[in-house]
UniProtKB/Swiss-Prot annotation:
MF (Gene Ontology): DNA binding
Subunit structure: The nucleosome is a histone octamer containing two molecules each of H2A, H2B, H3 and H4 assembled in one H3-H4 heterotetramer and two H2A-H2B heterodimers. The octamer wraps approximately 147 bp of DNA.
Name used for this protein in its record: Histone H4
Family that this chain belongs to: Belongs to the histone H4 family.
Subcellular location as annotated: Nucleus; Chromosome
Signal peptide: none
Single GO cellular component term: nucleus
Length: 18
């Protein structure tokens, strides 16, 4: 369960950094 949230959060953070 937390794995899915972690993956989405990771993509979100990458978009914010860019």
């Amino acid at each position: 369960i937390s794995g899915l949230i972690y993956e989405e959060t990771r993509i979100f953070l990458e978009n914010v950094i860019r």
